[in-house]
Amino acid sequence: MLLGASGAGKSTLLHLYRKAFPDAELEDRTLRPILYISLPSRVTVNDILSGLLEACGDPEPQKGTARSLLSRLYGLTKSLGVQLIIIDEIQHVLPEHTHRRTQEAADMIKSIMDRSLIPFVLAGLPHGNRILTDTVKGKHSEDQLIRRFNASVQLKPPALGSNAWKNLMAVYQKTIGVPCINLSSDEMLKRFYLASNGLHGFIANVLEHALESTDGNQQICMTHLSEAFDVSSYADLIENPFKMSLPQVERALALRANV
């Protein structure tokens, strides 16, 4: 399993991995080494099967019973040479009031793995691991999905003051493509950490909005970053770190660390 908070970089990591193993067009067929789907909310087992069939290129992915959908999926994954199936946003199989849907999804994934011998990566928010833990009770050990996913990776943001955090901001500095305030200075490292909690998605969001407010020739400055933060999803949660004085930023970081 690949788990992490929203904005931790799961989608970026999965995208880069898929990009490393693209489809290959042969004379008689397409090879698709990685099959990827992202689940919508309130998803059912049939929705998952239909999504996998659509990713395989099935012309009528929603047509048929669960049994017929499974049968077609086995045939298509074999002809496409699928070597890995990735299901993103796995937390959406978790119901609010009953474990039945979770158990059905777990049983379906286990059946596909057992018959096709194709490994799965399940990705999502940290509580997505309940698809493993909520389906243990009442199951024989050989039937439990948790036995098939005995290795989980938790994506966590780098710590403020770490080389990883400084290196991350240096990468953004290099890739932003326009003149920009020094993102890896001690001051900006603190401001961005308060703004994003170290999460990649929020950093990218602020920088994208800041970039949009320039004409491509202006240097991105504190004013652009401040305006960008005001339209971000964090704006209603904390005071704008790009408007605060540096001592205020440092106090806010200290308070957060002690919570």
Q: Which residues are covered by each model-predicted region?
A:
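Post-Walker A helix-loop "phosphate-sensing" segment adjacent to the P-loop in P-loop NTPases
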Residues: 19-30, 57-59
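A short hydrophobic beta-strand->loop->alpha-helix junction that borders the nucleotide-binding pocket
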Residues: 32-43
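C-terminal alpha-helical "lid" subdomain
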Residues: 143, 160-166, 171-259
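The feature captures the helix immediately C-terminal to the Walker
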Residues: 15-19, 204
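The catalytic "switch" region of P-loop NTPases
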Residues: 92, 105-183, 187
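Switch/connector loops and helix/strand junctions flanking conserved nucleotide-binding motifs
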Residues: 10-11, 44-45, 128-133
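Mid-core helix/loop region of P-loop NTP-binding domains shared across ATPases and GTPases
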Residues: 44-51, 59-119, 164, 184-187, ...
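Walker A/P-loop nucleotide-binding motif
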Residues: 1-15
